[in-house]
Structure formats: C-alpha cells, structure tokens
Amino acid sequence: MNKFASIGVGLLLLGSAVAAQAADTLSGNVTLATDYRFRGISQLEGGGWSPAIQGGFDWKPASGFYLGTWASNVNFSGGDIEVDLYGGYGNKINDTVSYDFGFYYYGYPNDGHNFNQNENKLNLAYYEYYGDISFMGVKLGVNYSPDYFAETGDFSYWYAEYSTKIADKVTVAAHYGYNKFDQKRFLGNRDYYSDWKVSAAIDGLGVTWTLAYVATNLDSDQECFGDKDLCEATAVFSISKAL
C-alpha cells in the first residue's frame, strides 16, 4: 500500500474512533494540501506542487491539559512519513488573554531515522518545548529544541502571528517566524533565517478552503539543504475537514 493510502486509511479508522467518543474531549482533522511547508521550507522534495495528506487527533479534557498526534507524508532522503506527538496545558487569564505551553516530538518512523547529508547519517527525530500567549487575535510564541532536526544542535523559533475574521466564514492571517540555529550546518554561512506566510480561509461545503503565500529569505542551494526550490516562495492551497 502506498504512503498516501496508508495515511488515509489510518485517518479514516481513527476517525471512526473519534465519532464514538465524547465530542467535548476528542476531535480530529484531515487536510489535503498542494505542499507541506514547515517554517517556510518544503518537506517534499522539489517543493512547489507536491501533494500532502495530513491529519491528527486531539484529546482536550476540561482541565486544560491536552494530548495529540499528527501525521503527514514527507519526501526527503531518510523518511517518507512524519508522525508527531505532543502534550501541554492551555488556559485563559481573562476574556481576551490566553496562554499555552507544552512539549512536541517530531518522529520519522521509516528508513531508520537517518538523513543522508554529505554521506553522513544523521538522526531526523527531535523534540521541542513551546510556549505562547494570545490576545485580541495576536499570538506571540517561542519553541526551543536542544538538538534540532538532523542533529543541528540548539535551535529556537520565535514567531508572531495575527488572524481575524473579515466576514462570517472568512478568516485572514499573517505569520512571521525567526529561526535561530546553534550551528551553520545546512544554511551556508548563516545560522538563522526568516519565514513568513499570509493566508485566507473560507468555510464552505463542510470543509475549510485555504490559500496561503509562503516564503523565506533563503535564496540559494547552499542555504537550503542543497535545493533552493525547497525554500522559494510559493502558493499553497489546502482543503481541511474537522472530524
């Protein structure tokens, strides 16, 4: 069974389990997208219009604690599926201010967790701690990993985003992220880069239709894992369904 079918069947089976649970504690989602961009960089070789099927499940009891999992196909040397696990706590300070913090694990269960970079076998899997605060449509957050993707050492991700409804079923959003590495392993002579995204989402026909423009300031093969196409600006279209 190919990787798209495997992920799809798994999501459908888990979706059946979700339907049998209490609606206020367990939920799910599935997305079909033209690309999988993570912090501005495509996780699918060649970048651009490379289809991704993604989905996840969240357990959120009334206490504010939560657990979840999320998966997507990827396409690079050393992995074709990403499976993530996360957990944390979120709550409100008042009617307009809320916060969230937790732990996120990024796993690549296939192909021995190895990424072949210049004939070196490097561990793909890593984890992050994260925290954010939200108020009046603005979110400010930071993620930190002591040993980031492919053993690149200390890494921090600082970001700001804003979203608002401009009509009953239309939401627009903007995001800016600053990626800071401890080592200059994959980014040429630099140890940081920026990514940004603007998007518009419309709810209709039981799904959410989203069009986003995603970009980074990485503009050469040397700065972007040997393939600048992975980091070039692109439009990403997706269809999402809540389960």
Give the location of each predicted region.
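Repeated loop/turn-to-beta-strand initiation elements of outer-membrane beta-barrel proteins
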Residues: 26, 63-69, 95-101, 137-142, ...
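Transmembrane beta-barrel strands of outer-membrane/channel proteins
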Residues: 30-34, 69-73, 101-105, 133, ...
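Short glycine/proline- and aromatic-enriched beta-strand/turn motifs that initiate or cap beta-hairpins
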Residues: 22-75
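Residue-level signature of outer-membrane beta-barrel architecture
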Residues: 59-61, 89-91, 105, 133-135, ...
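Cleavable N-terminal export/targeting peptides
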Residues: 1-25
